[in-house]
Design a protein with these regions (language model features):
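Bacterial N-terminal signal peptides that target proteins for export
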Residues: 2-11
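Low-complexity, intrinsically disordered segments exposed to solvent
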Residues: 25-276
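Hydrophobic alpha-helical targeting segments used for export or membrane insertion
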Residues: 14-16
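C-terminal motif of bacterial Sec signal peptides marking the signal peptidase cleavage site
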Residues: 20-23
Length: 276
């Protein structure tokens, strides 16, 4: 009888351990599935800001009238047979602080016309190019489609397999955007007075390898005058971010300020984000 009792007791203890173990695992699963996870928001904001900085480098290069003596060097290679030119922005092999960020490597632009001319087509790739020690890879295509119905210059921006290699992992993005130049079109050699309204959508992967999609639900205002005091130029607008394993997040870019503060909204709860 005593032996039977001990066996029953042992079975009961083992059963309790197993039940407790599975209960703990269930709780861990629930804890790990953080419904307030903002990884997709952080990663999209980083790659968005990287694209904006590259676009600024391209605009800055196009308004330069001659090759500079200091880094970065602007090198133009003509190809008469194809009616295309190549513009290389060369920062060198070591980090160089330019337009607010550390850069090294090359940005390579193949183009057929000046940036602000109707029909201009710019295809941009990279050679060992880093921004703030993050390796940038992929392709950007910018097309000037001429004047729209509002008599403003309109651009189409295609993002093709853009990768940002960070210390935490790789961020990937593919997207299509429309950029309307609503102010500054009359002074094509002074890009800091440009204001764009931007709409579009994209899909990508975060550093945690979870996929996401984004859609601009209220046009983003790109105020390039903000470059005078900040590296953040989006002063208002709304973006919907939809990670594959979480619910919708809303990015609210603010109220016309040239700051780097953005609100991520999840089910009416607001979480401040700061980009730099």
């Amino acid at each position: 009888m005593i032996r039977i009792f001990k066996t029953k007791k042992l079975v009961s203890i083992l059963t309790l351990i197993v039940i407790t173990s599975f209960s703990c695992k269930d709780e861990n699963v629930l804890d790990n599935l953080d419904q307030n996870n903002l990884q997709a928001c952080h990663d999209y904001l980083l790659i968005e800001k990287t694209i904006i900085d590259i676009e600024r480098e391209i605009e800055h290069a196009f308004i330069s009238t001659q090759t500079t003596k200091n880094i970065p060097n602007y090198i133009t290679i003509n190809s008469d047979t194809s009616n295309q030119d190549t513009l290389i922005i060369r920062f060198g092999e070591d980090n160089f602080l330019h337009l607010g960020h550390l850069k090294r490597g090359e940005i390579i632009i193949i183009y057929n016309k000046f940036l602000y001319d109707s029909g201009a087509n710019l295809s941009t790739t990279f050679s060992d190019f880093y921004i703030n020690n993050n390796l940038v890879q992929g392709n950007m295509i910018l097309k000037n489609t001429g004047l729209n119905q509002n008599e403003n210059i309109e651009f189409i921006l295609e993002i093709n397999n853009m990768n940002i290699n960070t210390e935490n992992g790789i961020i990937n993005l593919n997207g299509n955007y429309s950029k309307e130049l609503v102010e500054g079109g009359g002074s094509e050699y002074l890009y800091l007075d440009n204001i764009y309204n931007v709409v579009g959508s994209a899909n990508g992967n975060s550093v945690n390898n979870n996929s996401f999609t984004i859609n601009i639900t209220e046009p983003l205002k790109y105020n390039l005058f903000c470059f005078e005091s900040s590296s953040c130029i989006i002063t208002n607008g709304i973006v919907s971010v939809n990670p594959s394993i979480y619910g919708e997040r809303i990015l609210d870019y603010g109220d016309e300020s040239c700051d780097c503060e953005i609100s991520a909204i999840i089910e009416d709860e607001s979480y401040p984000l700061i980009i730099n």
